[in-house]
Amino acid sequence: MNKNYYAILMAGGVGSRFWPVSTTEFPKQFHDMLGSGDTLIQKTFSRLSKLIPVENILILTNEKYNNLVLEQLPMVKQEQVLLEPAMRNTAPCILYASLKIKKQNPDALMVVAPSDHWIEDENLFTENLKQCFDFCSKEDSLMTLGIKPTFPNTGFGYIEYNKSDNNPIKTVSQFREKPDYETAKSFLASGNFLWNGGIFIWSVKSIVAAFEKFQPQMTGLFLKGFENYNTNSEAAFINDNYANAENVSIDYAILEKAKNVYVLPATFDWNDLGTWGSLHEKLDKDENNNAVVNATVLLNNSSSNIISTSKDKLVIIDGLEDFIVVDKDNVLLIYPKSKEQEIKGIVASLKK
């Protein structure tokens, strides 16, 4: 394996649209959402380790999930787990991890990947990632893997690339925020828009240079502790300084400003597993389009539902269509799939 290959696995999210299974104490990346025997973070780590040395995969997560990471990924050492003492979006944590890697290996090439996505053909993913690494090793570039849209989704940001670019790797024209439905339809009709899946590839030299140019204040904050990285004093420096970083995404902080941004349209099948509905799409279904995770079910006159319970639960349903049925601990959720985006708000209101 190439010792210059590194990965940053983003594992700090809560996944509140998957409540009541995904909670602040035990978020979705640490669950076996697909009923496959592996949690989402385990599947993602395994996928990345086909190309990247295990010791070069860093896990970025919240302090409260440290034990969960070490339990589910026993091959990972504590120094590979980067703990955020405060939630500051994606730019600060990516800069922190990039500087830590740069100190260890100035020639490093790295991928930033979410820990909770579903990818069908892992060999194609590996091929695409290798193609991006090869490009970034030769060019001063910031790359992303774009996902070919299959319908006008209003829940994703979009990447517009140069229509006249006939190369496999395209020049990015601009990043577009989550659109309304009509705008999303126009994006698909244009033919040069991709979903932003949040998978980024670059050399540490290129990303650190971009931070120095576009985020000098944030870069100064984290460079102040450069001598502490990969030493026993790293945690103390991060605890004392991390919360002072601006709360900003990598898209807004860097990618929307830089001119050397490229995209490779991915050839693998992808799903962000962001909602119960998206999980329903990827699970095996019966002849009436019902998907079941763990439960034993008896279904009559019911279709297009997703049912998730513990393995010892018997669920009997009659006359239900397009619903989410989730039984977890002391919560039973029965909710229309068409209103699944409301679940996040329900969780917030329950906390008040």
Where do the PLM segments sit?
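Residue-level signal for inorganic ion chemistry
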Residues: 41, 97, 116, 159, ...
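Left-handed beta-helix
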Residues: 2-4, 204-352
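Glycine-rich phosphate-binding "P-loop"
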Residues: 29-35
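Short beta-strand segments
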Residues: 9-11, 60, 111-114, 144-148, ...
